[in-house]
Amino acid sequence: MAKDKDVRPIIKLKSTAGTGFTYVTRKNRRNNPDRLVMKKYDPVVRKHVDFREER
Protein backbone atom coordinates (compact mmCIF):
# COMPACT_ATOMS: atom_id res chain seq x y z
CA MET A 1 0.00 0.00 0.00
CA ALA A 2 2.33 2.79 1.22
CA LYS A 3 5.45 0.82 0.28
CA ASP A 4 5.87 2.69 -3.03
CA LYS A 5 6.24 6.16 -1.47
CA ASP A 6 8.35 5.09 1.51
CA VAL A 7 10.59 7.80 2.99
CA ARG A 8 13.55 5.38 3.20
CA PRO A 9 13.31 3.05 0.19
CA ILE A 10 15.67 0.15 -0.47
CA ILE A 11 18.02 0.97 -3.37
CA LYS A 12 20.71 -0.87 -5.31
CA LEU A 13 24.18 0.60 -5.72
CA LYS A 14 25.85 -0.67 -8.91
CA SER A 15 29.59 -0.55 -9.58
CA THR A 16 30.83 1.93 -12.19
CA ALA A 17 33.74 -0.41 -12.98
CA GLY A 18 31.36 -2.47 -15.13
CA THR A 19 31.65 -5.66 -13.09
CA GLY A 20 27.95 -5.89 -12.26
CA PHE A 21 28.65 -6.04 -8.51
CA THR A 22 25.95 -4.39 -6.38
CA TYR A 23 25.37 -3.30 -2.80
CA VAL A 24 21.90 -2.93 -1.29
CA THR A 25 21.19 -0.06 1.10
CA ARG A 26 18.49 2.41 2.13
CA LYS A 27 18.40 6.15 1.61
CA ASN A 28 16.31 9.01 2.91
CA ARG A 29 14.43 10.68 0.04
CA ARG A 30 13.90 13.91 1.97
CA ASN A 31 17.62 14.47 2.62
CA ASN A 32 18.96 13.02 -0.67
CA PRO A 33 16.43 13.47 -3.48
CA ASP A 34 19.06 13.03 -6.24
CA ARG A 35 20.91 9.84 -7.14
CA LEU A 36 23.28 8.52 -4.51
CA VAL A 37 27.00 8.01 -5.32
CA MET A 38 29.26 6.25 -2.81
CA LYS A 39 32.85 5.07 -2.98
CA LYS A 40 32.91 1.42 -1.89
CA TYR A 41 35.03 -1.70 -2.37
CA ASP A 42 34.46 -3.82 -5.48
CA PRO A 43 35.85 -7.32 -4.80
CA VAL A 44 35.85 -8.26 -8.50
CA VAL A 45 38.46 -5.62 -9.43
CA ARG A 46 39.84 -5.48 -5.85
CA LYS A 47 39.66 -1.68 -5.69
CA HIS A 48 37.53 1.09 -4.25
CA VAL A 49 35.31 2.49 -7.01
CA ASP A 50 32.21 4.69 -7.26
CA PHE A 51 28.86 2.95 -6.87
CA ARG A 52 25.82 4.75 -8.31
CA GLU A 53 22.17 4.36 -7.45
CA GLU A 54 20.34 2.15 -9.93
CA ARG A 55 16.70 2.80 -10.82
Curated annotation (Swiss-Prot):
Keywords from the named record: Ribonucleoprotein, Ribosomal protein
Similarity annotation: Belongs to the bacterial ribosomal protein bL33 family.
HAMAP family attached to this UniProt entry: Ribosomal_bL33
GO MF terms, alphabetically ordered: structural constituent of ribosome
GO BP terms, alphabetized: translation
SUPFAM superfamilies found in the cross-reference section: Zn-binding ribosomal proteins
Identification of the protein by name: Large ribosomal subunit protein bL33
Record organism: Kocuria rhizophila (strain ATCC 9341 / DSM 348 / NBRC 103217 / DC2201)
InterPro entries: Ribosomal_bL33, Ribosomal_bL33_CS, Ribosomal_bL33_sf, Ribosomal_zn-bd
Gene Ontology CC terms: cytosolic large ribosomal subunit
